[in-house]
Amino acid sequence: MARFPLVPTAPEPERAILVGVEWRDNAWPLDRSLDELERLAHTAGAQCVARLSQRLVKPYPKSFIGSGKVEELCGLVHRMDADVVIFDDDLTPSQQSYLEKAVGEPVKIIDRTALILDIFGLHAQTREGRLQVQLAQLQYLLPRLRGMWSHLAKEQTRGGIGSRFGQGESQLEVDRRLIRNKIAALRREIKQVEQRRDVQSKSRIESSAFRVALAGYTNAGKSTLLNRLTGSTVLSQDKLFATLDPTTRSYRLPGGRGMTITDTVGFIQKLPHGLVDAFKSTLSEVLGADLILKVVDASDEDYERQLEAVDRVLDEIGAGERLTLTVFNKIDLLDSVDRLSFRRRFPEAVLFSAQTGEGLDDLVDRIAREAAATDVLLSADIPYREGALITLVHEQGTLLHEEYLEDGVRIVAKLPARVAPRLERYRTE
């Protein structure tokens, strides 16, 4: 008999081989892109055991990589006892099917998009988030159904990366017509959620609160910034895509001006277009903001490329022309020389540490200044019977002059742009 009770052990992580291609016009160095792919694989529960790379002008139509590299990959899979091969670029359904036959069962072949979708499936917490992930997964799977029929039963029993798509659902067991019907049904459900969100957003729009949205590369520290600023306890982890569902918190700026700040899903290079499309309702929080804080990990050597990736996604969702403020986070990890370099190169940006709180006062001051810049200077004679409007000016505006007249109050005040129209009929200038 055992002297100690047996403790259940965690399942062994899947052994993954990463495959990357160095293209002539690579925006990122291949090794850095594969580093990020390895972090994605780790987030999904895999252990990277080897890497394989090739320099190409364009992918091979049948196999994506050359035949010699396919043979090398097969040998590497055997030697490393790999469970899954992850490509850093998108594979066509026929390329994926060819490679699966080449390496042999039970090894899985997936691409970067499938890996990101898998992580989203793990991290979606709300009904809206799960609906959006299911939609993106089904859109990805639909053109791949032909090659999946022979592997479907095995995938569902093997588990692990690439097999969590639609867990608990039967959509993979039905034909294309039913898949399309499911996609249509998900779109309708998401539309209903959007309508409820629109009601909530309209309520926020009608309030005088200055609306701020956090946007940035995944793991740049957006959730930690939200927690540091508002004193909340939003989940913050050193993992890619730890936050999928938008979270809004309230904050009062110096002088009493109200503010809402919303944390949103992180961006990443090669972000699948299907995810951008599926998460449009979530990303609409960025579109509705008065100010977008672009949060950047200053300690990452690829911070400039990450900032470019964020700008591309903002452009894609129609937020490229919105008012933005760049916040370089994690400056506690920089030495004095690097900090000085950032200040010289980005004089309009805020240097900040969500971990230690350094730079918090500067950040709040910059947000307050941006909020004040959107205010409207207004003079009005408000009749005494409109006591609610007079109170509104005192509570929501900055009163510059107040004079009591025989039939009302003459005020000169700076008011939030969303409040000023309520006084328009009494305006005197």
Q: Whereabouts are the PLM-identified features?
A:
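N-terminal accessory targeting/assembly segments
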Residues: 1-116
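Short alpha-helix plus adjacent loop in nuclease-associated cores
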Residues: 114-133
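Conserved C-terminal guanine-recognition region of P-loop GTPase G domains, centered on the G4
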Residues: 26, 32-42, 70, 74-79, ...
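Short, ordered loop/turn segments at secondary-structure junctions
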Residues: 23, 53-54, 89-91, 112-115, ...
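C-terminal-of-GTPase-core extension/linker across diverse P-loop GTPases
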Residues: 1-19, 23, 38, 143-220, ...
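Switch I (effector-binding) loop of TRAFAC-class P-loop GTPase G-domains
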Residues: 2-4, 197, 203-210, 228-260, ...
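Flexible beta-alpha connector loops of hexameric P-loop NTPases
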Residues: 24-29, 59-63, 123-129, 171, ...
